[in-house]
Structures are given as C-alpha cells and as structure tokens.
C-alpha cells in the first residue's frame, strides 16, 4: 500500500511528490499524459518570471527542474493512465482505480489535476485530422520550427494573439483570422499586434484545407468571409488553430468519494488544502480557498501543505511540518553532488 497517491503530474503534483518523499512517505504519481509537467507543456518557450527567487527562464527548463525535483525520492510513476474512481474504504485506506484496470491502495490521496483534463478544440472540417502529424498545429512547441514560414493562425483569444506576436519575429509572414469583427484579447496584446507585421482578416474562418500531392500536408487554405460568403484561396506552410480548450472533470463528477465543490471545475477547500473528506487533499489550480493565487509559486505552497496534512493523517504524532532542506540530513549525500559544481 502506498502512503499517498498523487493524481496529476504538473507543478503542484510534482512538488507534492518531492515534499511527501522528504517526509518519508511512499508515493505514487498517476497522470493521464505521456509525460510529467502538466499544462506547462502548452507553452514550453514562454518565459516564466513569477516564481519567487528563480531567475526568468523558458518554461521547458521549469518543466525539467520540477520533474527532476519531483522524482528525487523515486516515487512510482504511472503515465498515460486515467483515474476513473477514488473510493474511501475506511480510515487510512483509499482505492484509486484507473482505466487500465489497476486498483491502487493508498493511505491518503492528493488531487493535483489543475483545471481538469484539457484538450485543444479541434478544427471541425473535412480531412483536418490527417494533417495533425504534419503542418496543422494546436500547440506551438517551438518557435524555431516556423522560421521563414508563411503561417496562418485561426483564433481571436489571448493565445492566438500571443502566438502571432511571438511568431512575427520568426516567420516570413503571419496571417491572423477570426470570426468576429474585433479581437477579444487583452488590450496590451492587441496594441502590440498593431505594431507588428501581422496581417489580420476579421469575419473570416477556414472553409477548406487543400492537401499536397501526397495528401499528408496542407498546401493551401480556402478562407471564407462570413459576412459576404466570398472565398479566397491562399498558400501557407503551417496552420495553427487556437480556438480554446475543452475541459473535462469527469473524475470529480463520477468519483465514489464525493468532495464538496466550489464550482464545476474547482474543489472547495481550505488554505491548508484540506477538503470535505479526511485523508483526501488537493493542491494547485484544482482547489479553491480564500487565500488562493493562481500561480505556479502558490501551487508549491499548496503542495507542501497537502503533503504535511497527509503525513499527519497517516501518523497523527508526526511533526506538523518537514525539516527545512538546508539542515536536513536526508540531503547529506545529495548535497555533496551539488556542491561539486561550486568547488
């Protein structure tokens, strides 16, 4: 039996894993994705500024650091596995069931699933699916990939504007289309867009994708003006779709362990990450409490609190908090490795 099962492998779940390990608990992380890091993979090249004491760095480096830290105490990790039920059997005994038929037993559970499972909204037109592996994109993983390319972006939200702004410095041309007359992003982003060489086509959407001879890549796009019905054929090297995300929270809706909810996507909790069920805690964006700040930095605080409560739930006589890392003997050998860089 595990001491704690952490559902979710984003920044909150990873720090909960680290801190639970620091507190001597046996940990298992379960995540539906094929890699750890959570939603941070949506914006890997964005610069993260708001983690206290950490110099600005690209998100992919933050991912690397949080994953390395989260795995420091060698937790069990189950990837590409969806949790479909949480059951509280008795005091200090939970069962966590997954879509692979596994039923894991644990003394406590920490839910760290962010805003739930998110999936980019797909382009709903004929043959769109066949181009997903080539030049139809729903996430920008690397700006350099679009260097000297003619790029079409469909969308009017902040992500679409953000990508248009960033890609204008790499791509040969950027065309932004949106269905309404106006863009709905933040004013500062719209103002920045006006200063860049980005072609904007309002009242426009993608009518059809035209493939190359192999029918594996998009070669041209038929654009339709929604007001006039006029069609225009244009050539593009890459097409980016930014129509928002579909969110699902079926785990909390269908779980046998019914926690109190703040709204459809947030658990109602307390500043110490406790929920309405003893032994079940939540950290990161999935929990709402009065002191909540939706930052990666605050997810770390949530995670430490959740791990501390899990420890006290399992061992009521344990210390309320873990011993600080700077003076903790558990890091004695690891510190020697770290210090070699500075000697």
Swiss-Prot record:
Enzyme class (EC, first level): oxidoreductase
One Pfam entry name: Pyr_redox_2
Protein name: Ferredoxin--NADP reductase
Required co-factors: FAD
Cofactor binding summary note: Binds 1 FAD per subunit.
Reactions catalysed, as given in the entry: 2 reduced [2Fe-2S]-[ferredoxin] + NADP(+) + H(+) = 2 oxidized [2Fe-2S]-[ferredoxin] + NADPH
Sequence similarity: Belongs to the ferredoxin--NADP reductase type 2 family.
Protein keywords: FAD, Flavoprotein, NADP, Oxidoreductase
Quaternary data: Homodimer.
Protein EC: 1.18.1.2
Origin organism lineage: Bacteria, Bacillati, Bacillota, Bacilli, Bacillales
UniProt-recorded Gene Ontology molecular function terms: ferredoxin-NADP+ reductase activity; flavin adenine dinucleotide binding; NADP binding
Tree of life domain: Bacteria
Organism: Staphylococcus saprophyticus subsp. saprophyticus (strain ATCC 15305 / DSM 20229 / NCIMB 8711 / NCTC 7292 / S-41)
Residues reported in the UniProt entry to bind FAD: 31, 39, 43, 83, 118, 285, 326
């Amino acid at each position: 039996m595990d001491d704690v099962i952490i559902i979710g492998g984003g920044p909150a779940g990873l720090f909960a894993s680290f801190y639970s390990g620091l507190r001597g608990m046996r940990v298992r992380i379960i995540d539906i994705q094929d890699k750890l890091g959570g939603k941070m993979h949506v914006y890997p090249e964005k610069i993260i500024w708001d983690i206290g004491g950490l110099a600005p760095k690209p998100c992919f480096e933050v991912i690397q650091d949080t994953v390395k830290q989260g795995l420091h105490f060698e937790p069990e990790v189950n990837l590409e596995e969806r949790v479909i039920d949480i059951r509280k059997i008795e005091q200090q005994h939970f069962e966590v069931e997954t879509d692979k038929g596994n039923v894991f037993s644990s003394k406590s559970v920490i839910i760290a699933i962010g805003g739930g499972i998110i999936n980019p909204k797909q382009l709903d037109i004929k043959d769109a699916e066949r181009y997903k592996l080539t030049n139809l994109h729903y996430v920008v993983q690397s700006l350099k990939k679009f260097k000297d390319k003619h790029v079409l972006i469909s969308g009017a939200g902040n992500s679409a504007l953000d990508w248009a702004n960033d890609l204008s410095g790499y791509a040969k041309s950027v065309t932004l289309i949106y269905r309404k007359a106006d863009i709905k992003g933040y004013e500062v982003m719209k103002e920045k867009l006006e200063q860049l060489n980005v072609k904007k086509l309002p009242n426009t959407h993608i009518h059809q994708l035209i493939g190359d001879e192999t029918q594996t890549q998009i070669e041209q796009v038929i654009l339709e003006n929604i007001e006039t019905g006029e069609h225009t054929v244009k050539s593009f090297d890459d097409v980016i779709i930014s129509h928002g995300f579909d969110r699902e929270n079926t785990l909390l809706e269908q779980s046998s362990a019914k926690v109190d909810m703040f709204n459809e996507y947030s658990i109602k909790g307390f500043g110490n990450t406790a929920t309405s069920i003893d032994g079940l805690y939540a950290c990161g964006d999935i929990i709402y409490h009065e002191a909540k700040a939706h930052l990666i930095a605050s997810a770390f605080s949530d995670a430490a609190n959740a791990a501390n409560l899990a420890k006290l739930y399992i061992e009521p006589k344990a210390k309320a908090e873990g011993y600080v890392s700077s003076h903790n003997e558990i890091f004695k050998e690891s510190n020697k490795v770290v210090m070699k860089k500075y000697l």
